[in-house]
Design a protein with these regions (language model features):
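Preference for protein termini
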Residues: 1-472
Length: 472
């Protein structure tokens, strides 16, 4: 594995410009003062109740996500490259989804194999030929980005279904501004506070045609036992919209209504945080108690907008991910601004052979996996784990892809022994409305807190940082 790119210190220890003021501040701040504020941050997070659930964790169902008080900083120039690449990527994703559920030009052209679509469990034939308002399928995208050198930002994953984490981005900034006003006074940090307003505007803009009054938006949650329930409640409050469960909604005459103390009120847009399988027991899983019976009939009639659209899971499938550079080129006629990680498709015999011969050097992922589960990090795995994975690959090669072990960039992070570099990634949030694509400057920086670890997922012991984009 290559040496990780240090985001604060350049070659021969030269300080990178974006971090110059932070470096001076750190030198002026006694370690005990920094530690005190770190403890204050933890107390504030506990008081606010920012937690996430870990399924199958018998010891602690609710955990506090560790927060590191040293911000991750990017210059305006660096952000400009990222922003252009993200806009391009999400535009291509929306065109791809429109195409595979309609004309399927990309399949006829042989750019993406048909079997990868039609045999994919997250492809939704119910969406075939169905139009969605303004042709927007991915209203909210959380694109995972890693940095490997000064000029290269690489897409690790396209989260196009129900991306989470934006509440932590907003709360991280609020806590930092509260605890470190002196540090903000020394930087011109681009704000992220407008995200809820931008999200609400995007959602209202994609309401079905014919809605004359201000569209009514609701956030559909699976309920209090969902791992991201805190975020659902937080966002509904910030947006000023109703937080509803399936039982709060009813479909009448192919229109969706929510029950209120004043009677039924029509809903025009649902920001849904419920997976496709559970949305409508009449269409998908009949045992679902999380969804709304008849919701898909209202959707097919064009009387409700679902954000994100049903069927977007095909766009963040890890096997499809490997074709994204070709997808961008096919629809936009442009080279991708943001590169992909080199990916071996284990469904292809030649790639599988290479992966089996090099398991100890590779990262192997389930094509439908998430949260850092079900993956092999070869360099950190035991021989027994590698051999067990080898058997899995031989039995079900189409269920996996493999990638080189990337040297994720590092940022200074508080540890028990003082400041030390830790690996990070970045999840910016991209909002697509009827006319505009909006990206608040920043995102959720996730950090692998264990020394040497490359796994940043909170479910696997990772933490978060505030992300600063410097206005210049």
């Amino acid at each position: 594995m290559a040496v990780a790119f240090d985001e604060m210190n350049g070659p021969e220890g030269h300080l990178r410009t974006a971090y110059s003021e932070l470096s001076r501040w750190l030198k002026e701040t006694p370690p005990e003062a920094l530690d005190y504020r770190r403890q204050e941050a933890e107390l504030l997070f506990r008081r606010i109740g920012i937690t996430f659930a870990v399924y199958g964790d018998a010891e602690a169902q609710e955990r506090l996500i560790p927060f590191d008080v040293i911000p991750r900083i990017l210059s305006a120039k660096e952000w400009g490259i990222l922003e252009k690449g993200l806009r391009q990527r999400v535009r291509a994703l929306n065109m791809f989804l429109r195409d595979i559920y309609h004309g399927r030009d990309i399949l006829r052209a042989g750019v993406v194999p048909e079997g990868l679509i039609f045999q994919n469990p997250v492809f939704r034939p119910e969406m075939n030929g169905q139009d969605v308002p303004h042709d927007v399928y991915v209203h909210i995208a959380g694109i995972d980005i890693v940095r490997v050198d000064a000029d290269d930002f690489i897409v690790l994953e396209d989260n196009a279904r129900t991306p989470s984490g934006v509440s932590y981005m907003l709360e991280n900034r609020e806590i930092m501004m509260r605890l470190f006003p002196d540090l903000f006074a020394r930087h011109r940090v681009a704000p992220v506070e407008r995200y809820p307003d931008e999200l609400l505007a995007a959602l209202r803009s994609v309401a079905p045609g014919g809605v004359s009054a201000e569209p009514t938006v609701a956030l559909l949650t699976p309920g209090v036992y969902n791992s991201a329930y805190y975020e659902h409640s937080f966002l509904a409050d910030k947006l000023g919209i109703e937080l509803v469960e399936g039982r709060d909604l009813i479909v009448k005459n192919e229109e969706v209504f929510m029950r209120t103390t004043e009677g039924l009120k029509r809903v025009d847009v649902i920001y849904r945080r419920v997976d496709d399988d559970f949305l409508d027991p009449l269409t998908f899983r009949p045992d679902s108690v999380l969804g709304v019976p008849g919701l898909m009939s209202a959707y097919a009639a064009g009387n409700i907008t679902l954000a994100n659209a049903v069927g977007t899971g095909i766009a963040d499938d890890k096997a499809i991910y490997s074709y994204m550079p070709d997808v961008v080129k096919f629809y936009l006629g442009e080279d991708p601004i943001l590169k992909n990680v080199q990916t071996w498709r284990c469904r292809e015999p030649k790639d599988l052979s290479y992966v089996l011969d090099n398991l100890s050097d590779l990262v192997v992922k389930e094509v439908h996996g998430s949260g850092g589960y079900g993956m092999l990090i070869g360099p950190a795995a035991t021989k027994a784990t590698i051999e067990a994975f080898r058997d899995k690959l031989k039995r079900e090669p189409e269920g996996f892809i493999a990638q080189p072990t990337l040297a994720l960039s590092t940022c200074p992070t508080c540890t028990a022994s003082g400041l030390a570099p830790r690996h990070v990634d970045l999840r910016p949030f991209v909002l697509t409305g009827s006319k505009h694509t909006t990206i608040v400057p920043g995102g959720l920086t996730r950090v692998a807190l264990r020394e040497g670890s490359l796994v940043v997922n909170s479910s696997q012991g990772g933490g978060t940082k505030d992300t600063w984009i410097l206005d210049e």
